């Protein structure tokens, strides 16, 4: 047949030969097996461009936008490009304009019929969202693992009484488990931020073309379903011009929150190393600590240092999308770089892995913590609280009395458990002299001494959210339930994506007779 337009059309309209079909089926089988087993780590730009092309072939064929006679050849070209890219060391193009030439080489110019109503803008916005989506699930997974270590450590130390600090100064006695649950609550909010960010990122831009849609009647919802997206980006301009720019910024905010929470915890532990007899340290060796090259007595907290450094790196990378998005016109690629944004999330994951090691390496000396509490006046507020709660002495009057006790004790090097009751009576009388309140200290000596017992103070707390045993049990159970819910959410979201891609593989395989 001569090479006329009509002859070319006839050639393009012929069904695939049986020999060609067999080759196509083997390639399709290999591609489907790889796609079904592809982990999130392997779902790069090339992978998603392949999935988008597969979905386009299926949908447009079903809906009459692609000549069914041409579909087998186009499907074969898609399958070949994907199979070639999956080979060891093979080139894996990451943009539409570098992916498409491989399709043309494999299937001829007919393969560009796939590009009906498509653009690099919506295709790249889609794969960027898909990759960020996978990254967020990886981050959520590690956050949950680290938070679980934190919560279980809290359960193990529910009744361990230690000093807590404000402004870097010993403030009040507390349960170490309660302190840890406070940090766990911060990470629980980070988990919530991940879910919220995920919902905004889990939206398909496909079918929005450049910025105002297309004249082709594309089935956007079906495309979203095949790619595992929960929703569509509603506004076509928003899809690639606005949303794809603010998504990395939002993920950066999540990574920043996690890194800041990690850094706060690490620094609180780090201050203990400044003391000569810390009540909390890292287990020596095992990469947790290292010796000084010059000073034999030193055991430097290397793991704390590296965790803090990694948290700082995560914050640094997380600021990148913010700075890159500042003062540029809508749609510019500056903050959209997949490699940079994945590196940002991976920095957050590494920080959490480091923190997990820190938590597992902590050694708490309960006796030393109690000694620390009893060597200072962290329980002094309880004197003012009891005077007001039981004897109607206004808090500020009681505070003046307690402050006077502390001043006298420090001037005379007296520890709380050794403070003379007679001096307490004298200081109280001076504090309330000339007022309408009881002129004699209404607390008996036994009550005065019990008020200075840090263990009794912790157990006697009565408000919700406190460190008392009943509340600790409730909050630990709640934290565990939250972790279980988050695990289920992660599993569900991954399952939705995997199931969607499996359906796409199955339907793509049907494109050949």
Describe the residue ranges of each PLM region.
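Conserved hydrophobic residue
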Residues: 65-66, 278-280, 393, 415
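N-terminal secretory signal peptides that target proteins for export/translocation
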Residues: 1-19
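Charged, flexible cofactor/metal-binding loops and thiol motifs
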Residues: 128-133, 137-144, 148, 155, ...
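A helix-coil-helix interface module used to build multimeric assemblies
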Residues: 20, 34-203, 207-213, 218-224, ...
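Bacterial N-terminal signal peptides
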Residues: 25-33
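Short, well-ordered beta-strand elements within core beta-sheets of diverse protein domains
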Residues: 57-65, 178, 249-257, 382-392
């Amino acid at each position: 047949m001569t090479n006329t337009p009509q002859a070319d059309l006839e050639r393009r309209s012929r069904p695939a030969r049986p020999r060609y079909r067999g080759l196509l089926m083997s390639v399709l089988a290999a591609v489907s097996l790889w796609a079904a087993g592809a982990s999130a780590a392997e779902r790069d730009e090339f992978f998603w461009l392949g999935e988008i092309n597969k979905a386009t072939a299926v949908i447009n064929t079903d809906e009459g936008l692609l000549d069914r006679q041409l579909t087998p050849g186009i499907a074969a070209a898609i399958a070949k490009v994907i199979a070639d890219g999956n080979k060891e060391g093979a080139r894996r193009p990451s943009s539409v304009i570098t992916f498409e030439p491989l399709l043309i080489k494999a299937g001829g110019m007919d393969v560009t019929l796939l590009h009906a109503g498509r653009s690099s803008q919506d295709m790249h916005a889609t794969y960027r969202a898909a990759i960020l989506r996978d990254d967020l699930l990886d981050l959520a997974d590690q956050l949950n693992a680290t938070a679980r270590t934190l919560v279980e450590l809290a359960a193990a130390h529910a009744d361990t009484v230690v000093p807590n600090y404000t402004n870097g100064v010993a403030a009040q006695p507390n349960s170490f488990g309660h302190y840890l649950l406070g940090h766990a609550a911060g990470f629980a909010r980070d988990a919530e931020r991940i879910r919220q960010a995920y919902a905004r990122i889990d939206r398909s831009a496909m079918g929005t073309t450049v910025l105002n849609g297309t004249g082709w009647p594309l089935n956007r919802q079906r495309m979203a379903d095949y790619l595992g997206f929960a929703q569509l980006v509603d506004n076509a301009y928003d899809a690639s011009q606005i949303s794809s720019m603010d998504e990395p910024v939002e993920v950066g905010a999540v990574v920043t929150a996690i890194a800041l929470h990690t850094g706060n915890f690490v620094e609180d532990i780090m201050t203990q190393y400044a003391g000569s007899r810390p009540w909390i340290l890292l287990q020596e060796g095992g990469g947790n600590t290292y010796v000084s090259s010059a000073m034999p007595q030193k055991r430097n907290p290397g793991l704390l240092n590296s965790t803090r450094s990694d948290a700082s790196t995560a914050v640094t990378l997380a600021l990148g999308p913010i700075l890159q998005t500042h003062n540029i016109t809508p749609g510019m690629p500056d903050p959209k770089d997949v490699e940079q944004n994945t590196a940002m999330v991976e920095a957050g994951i590494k920080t959490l892995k480091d923190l997990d090691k820190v938590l597992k390496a902590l050694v708490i000396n309960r006796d030393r913590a109690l000694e620390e509490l009893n060597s200072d006046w962290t329980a002094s507020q309880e004197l003012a609280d009891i005077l007001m709660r039981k004897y109607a002495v206004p808090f500020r009057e009681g505070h003046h009395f307690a402050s006077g006790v502390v001043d006298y004790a420090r001037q005379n090097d007296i520890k709380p458990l050794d403070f003379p009751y007679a001096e307490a009576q004298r200081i109280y009388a001076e504090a309330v002299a000339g007022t309408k309140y009881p002129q004699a200290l209404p607390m008996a000596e036994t009550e005065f001494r019990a008020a200075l017992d840090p263990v009794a103070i912790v157990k006697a707390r009565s408000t919700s959210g406190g460190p008392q045993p009943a509340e600790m049990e409730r909050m630990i159970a709640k934290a565990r339930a939250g972790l279980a819910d988050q695990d289920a959410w992660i599993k569900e979201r991954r399952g939705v994506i995997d199931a969607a891609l499996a359906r796409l593989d199955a339907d793509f395989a049907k494109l050949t007779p």
